């Protein structure tokens, strides 16, 4: 029932987005800007969509906050898939984009070095250990960083003073405008951990699992319920975009795409 409601919401919000002059096939590729955590899954979904519809799709990935800033400065994205709902909401509030809808969900996990003996029960103690290097993404630029700081606030309810300690020690290693990029063919988080830049890195569970596949010695630790933070991914379409933009947005909520998201570890909306 929830999926049906969300799909109806998306269709309603997209009503009027497509240009009345829309043509069945765009001459130029559809410009889709998407959160970096969607890189693998959205590349697969876009490839399948191209094969099915003939609409070419150009994907641009990055930290959602930085992508939103690029759009605000005039870049021509027609579909925006963010790792949160606040950045799409901000675009919608400015008037040029449709109201967003949640299309997938994620959550935070801890990616750790092999020598770190953390469990869900001891994760907070491990992160607070002064000898442990704690890595995160960059708040405001990347929702993953915002979610990490939300976790820090929850930690303060478990142990007084935890927020101040975690806020002071966290290393913002990814997601910022000047964050180093990994070499071609390497995932960001696997590379950061492989380089020893952090002992524990808070990232999306989908990223953590993918990083462990790339660097098998890394470990994935679930965040305990008291600290868990959910990530709702928001989808929006530029008002006046041609029909293929709306079609691709609809496709992301359709069962075939949702099955692909689930295969990569994402939760249903």
Regions found by a protein language model. Give the residues of each.
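Bacterial N-terminal signal peptides
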Residues: 5-16
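Residues embedded in well-ordered secondary-structure elements
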Residues: 6, 99, 224-226
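Central helical "cap/lid" subdomain
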Residues: 95-101
């Amino acid at each position: 029932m929830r999926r049906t409601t969300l799909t109806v919401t998306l269709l309603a919000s997209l009503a009027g987005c497509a240009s009345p002059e829309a043509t069945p096939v765009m001459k130029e590729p559809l410009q889709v800007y998407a959160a970096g955590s969607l890189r693998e899954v959205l590349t697969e979904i876009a490839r399948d969509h191209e094969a099915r519809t003939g609409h070419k799709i150009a994907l641009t990935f990055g930290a959602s906050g930085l992508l939103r800033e690029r759009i605000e400065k005039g870049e021509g994205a027609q579909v925006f898939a963010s790792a949160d709902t606040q950045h799409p909401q901000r675009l919608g509030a400015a008037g040029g984009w449709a109201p967003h809808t949640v299309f997938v969900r994620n959550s935070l996990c801890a990616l750790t070095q092999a020598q770190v003996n953390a469990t869900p029960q001891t994760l907070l103690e491990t992160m607070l250990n002064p000898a442990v290097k704690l890595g995160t993404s960059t708040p405001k630029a990347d929702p993953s960083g915002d979610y990490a700081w939300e976790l820090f606030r929850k930690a303060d309810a478990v142990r007084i003073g935890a927020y101040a300690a975690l806020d002071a020690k966290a290393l913002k290693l990814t997601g910022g405008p000047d964050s180093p990029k990994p070499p071609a063919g390497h995932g960001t988080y696997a590379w950061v951990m492989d380089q020893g830049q952090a002992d524990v890195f808070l990232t999306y569970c989908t990223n953590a699992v993918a990083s462990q596949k790339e660097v098998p010695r890394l470990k994935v630790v679930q965040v305990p319920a008291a600290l868990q933070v959910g990530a709702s991914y928001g989808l929006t379409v530029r008002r006046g975009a041609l029909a293929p933009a709306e079609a691709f947005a609809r496709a992301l909520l359709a069962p075939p795409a949702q099955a692909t998201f689930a295969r990569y570890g994402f939760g249903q909306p």
